[in-house]
Amino acid sequence: MQKLKNCVKRFIKKDGFIYRIVRKIYHILSTAKYKITNNKKIKEEHKHYSIVVNEAVEKLKNYKDADYVVFYNPTWLGVANSTKGLFKNIVPLEHVYEKKDIQKITDAIVENNIKSVIFSQICDGWIDTIKQIKDKNKEIKIKVIWHGNCYEYFSDFTWNLNKEVMNLYKKGKIDSFAFVRSIMYEFYKKAGFKSYYLQNNVHLDNIERVEKQKTDKKKIGIYNADTRELKNIYTSLSAIKLVPNAIADVVPINEGAKKFTEILKLETTSIDDYIPTEELLKRIQQNEVNLYPTFTENAPMFPLESFEMGVPCLLGNNNDYFVGTKLGEYVILTKEDDPEYLKDRIINCIEHKEEIIQLYKEWKKDFDKKCESYVKDFVKN
């Protein structure tokens, strides 16, 4: 079936009438096949999602007469951490598939007199939830935080979701958007969408600080890169190989990266799978520096998390952090795909580690105030 779809895509104009019909048929057949072959699994998943809805309904009672609440999916770790770092009135909510569950959420919002509902990204079922809330009470403001950038439109899922969300805005079902990268905010504002700017932030005072083990080796971390091309893991590994006496700590490490380190004879202390955020934050405290030289980005949480743990993080020139500051001169990369350049920046970062961390602490004070003001502006308007 996938081969047939790919064949059709080669010869039919994307977003043309025939293509849309074929895509719709393909989607219907694929969905039917999945439901038949995974009936038991689907029932269990939907039962879980209904339980989460009931928990959300109970939590909404705590925000009676509130100016706003924010729904977020706790299983989407980046979005979840972003939401927790920005807002106080937050409600975990996963996918919503049952009509009765959409009705429960809608009724709870209306009955608790919540003035504004913010959706931090969009899960399955949230589009229908937005429609129903507006149909029941058009005075309730609906706002959406878009955590992605234009690169993600290459994904059919994200592109189709983007079209649905933008169409809801044009129909008056969504009142405004917030973006966590300035270029996205500026573009959509100029394109006529009511837009606000937010900046991701982290507060990690509750994370245990661990004593760094004494060693002659320089441990350098690469995290949450996995197999995604944009995360640039192979350039990072190449650069670490060039750093004298260096060890790469890669979590998770995929088979390709593992083979590459063997070819390079690069020593690693790595794990094959993702680990809980709390465990990761303790782990990185053993490092000299962490690498995040992605080819495209939005507002990544990890660089901030790394700095909060006292470890500098080199990051790509594709987000809003540290721009125009001395700190940025140390840690913002301009040639993410150059191992030799990256090696030099790693060494420079290690040599100036104490100064870099101090610069971060000074920068963070002003950054916290900015983040709070952006949130207030978004919530009240």
Where are these regions (language model features)?
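Short hydrophobic beta-strand element within catalytic cores of glycosyltransferases
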Residues: 312-318
